[in-house]
Regions:
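N-terminal presequence-like segments and the immediate start of the first folded domain
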Residues: 1-57, 61-75, 80-129
Length: 129
């Protein structure tokens, strides 16, 4: 995988503008992961940081089930009910993805609400191996 960054500002924010992945034989398209437990019940009301952490745990579990991990993530879509609060906690993404040596391209969108009331953060991913 080769990073494509015509400018360096996104690198400072922890993501690449694009990545070229050659020879990928398998792709996994992950549904949005949120801060829910194994029964699908929302967790950590009003705690953006805890919700981001649990959503990342759930993303890792889905990837593991597909025989992949965060190092395989090629693109992220992120939805937050409070973009400023989410950005304050983006160090969590940096720690998780940084430990795998990747900074996948991402889009962050502010939304009025997510599908389940009380959820503040959702992350979806495309992974390739």
């Amino acid at each position: 995988r080769t990073a494509v960054n015509p400018w360096d500002w996104s690198i400072k924010l922890g993501y690449n503008q694009a990545e070229v992945i050659e020879g990928a034989a398998r792709q996994v398209i992950c549904a949005g992961q949120t801060a829910v437990d194994s029964d699908g019940s929302p967790q950590h009301p009003d705690d953006m940081r805890a919700q981001i952490s649990l959503a990342l745990n759930n993303l890792e579990a889905v990837l593991k089930g597909a025989g992949m991990d965060l190092s395989n993530v090629a693109k992220l879509g992120i939805y937050a009910t409070d973009v400023d609060e989410a950005l304050k906690n983006f160090d969590l993404l940096g720690m998780r993805f940084g430990s795998h040596g990747v900074a996948p391209p991402m889009t962050l969108l502010g939304v009025t609400r997510l599908a389940i009331p009380g959820l503040l953060f959702e992350i979806e991913a495309v992974a390739a191996a």
